Amino acid sequence: MKDYKNYIFDLYGTLVEIHTEEGEDELWKKLSFFYGFYGAVYEPEELQESYLALVASEKNSYAHEAYPEIELEYVFQKLFEKKGVQADMELAVHAGQFFRILSMEYVKLYDGVKEMLELLHKKGKKVYLLSNAQEIFTTYELRYLGLIPYFDDIFISSSCQCKKPDIKFYKMLLEKHQLKIEDCVMIGNDNTTDIAGAKELGMDSLYIHSNLSPELTGEPDSTYYMEEMDMKKLMEML
């Protein structure tokens, strides 16, 4: 593998293993309690249907974007407003985080992640995160996992209102830090987002087929390819 100056990582399925279940009846029952505590009384099924409808509406408002990304905190705020409750953004964020915690079975680092990131820093490399994710979830999960200090900068799609494979998302990082494409490599577990965007931009990439990767038909469109998650092997490549 070529020696790069800048290493750009995806998060979920690449550095972090996570499992969430958003369709469980118990989740919506408990979330309806949360909203009811603040005067926004929902039946669980009504709350779920309202949430899904608002998510669809928010996505439609960004229909001019090729790969739009919404900010979910506004959905959780509108769920209060729909019941006549004026909720500030702090309460909306807390509602969203409660939803996330209820949905989460686990979130953890793949073995060896911190050692791998430390190795890159010891070699004088820059390390960036480029994640299709929600700010109100991911920033706190990064803090919980102790990952924030390992990145030179973090880009989360909901804050940028676009997501991979949109090359605009990659360019935000490149332009902010004045990086040359040839000095960068994108590392991710999704051929249709992480790798596709890098390829369109002309950036080298490493595809890792992890347990969270979407089904892959044929060979990935990446410069390099790992058939399974193996942080020790990755460290040897770097």
Model-derived segments and their meaning:
Residues 8, 16-17, 53-58:
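Short glycine-rich His-centered loop
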Residues 66-74, 82, 88-89, 98-128, ...:
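Short, acidic loop-to-helix structural element flanking the phosphoryl-transfer center
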Residues 24, 69, 109, 131, ...:
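Charged, low-complexity surface patches
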Residues 32, 45-97:
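A metal-dependent, Asp-based hydrolase signature
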Residues 22-35:
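Basic, amphipathic juxtamembrane/active-site segments
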Residues 29, 70-74, 136, 168:
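A generic alpha-helix surface/boundary motif
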Residues 1-7, 17-21, 38-45, 90, ...:
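Asp-based, Mg2+/Mn2+-dependent phosphohydrolase catalytic module
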